[in-house]
Swiss-Prot record:
It comes from Homo sapiens (Human). Residues 1-19 form the signal peptide. This is Immunoglobulin lambda variable 4-3. Residues 21-122 form the Ig-like domain. GO terms for cellular component: extracellular region; immunoglobulin complex; plasma membrane. The gene is IGLV4-3.
Length: 122
């Protein structure tokens, strides 16, 4: 029985002069190979309509864009991201769900605020 570990680190990137949101994530998670796992990124309540972006970072590599997740739960994936990666939303929470976990999914996962509110850049 093999486990896959995930390390979660929120970060913020923004180009506007608006107050910055606070993003929180649990520090780590793990699951069995072949299982599913849901990672959570929580926005501060006053920024609950913001869009976030999920990134995967393996040791010694640059972050790889996975997807954007909007407040309505819709998501758009980066090039080459498999169908087993899904995004969703509930209130101020944005989720990244993996199904059929594979050993190469073990990495750090970052969520970042993309400074998009209801489809408009702020």
């Amino acid at each position: 029985m093999a486990w896959v570990s995930f390390y979660l680190l929120p970060f913020i990137f923004s180009t506007g002069l608006c107050a910055l949101p606070v993003l929180t994530q649990p520090p780590s998670a793990s699951a069995l190979l072949g299982a599913s796992i849901k990672l959570t990124c929580t926005l501060s309540s006053e920024h609950s309509t913001y869009t976030i972006e999920w990134y995967q970072q393996r040791p010694g590599r640059s972050p790889q864009y996975i997807m954007k997740v909007k407040s309505d739960g819709s998501h758009s994936k980066g090039d080459g991201i498999p169908d087993r990666f899904m995004g969703s939303s509930s209130g101020a929470d944005r989720y990244l769900t993996f199904s059929n976990l594979q050993s190469d999914d073990e990495a750090e996962y970052h969520c970042g605020e993309s400074h998009t509110i209801d489809g408009q850049v702020g």
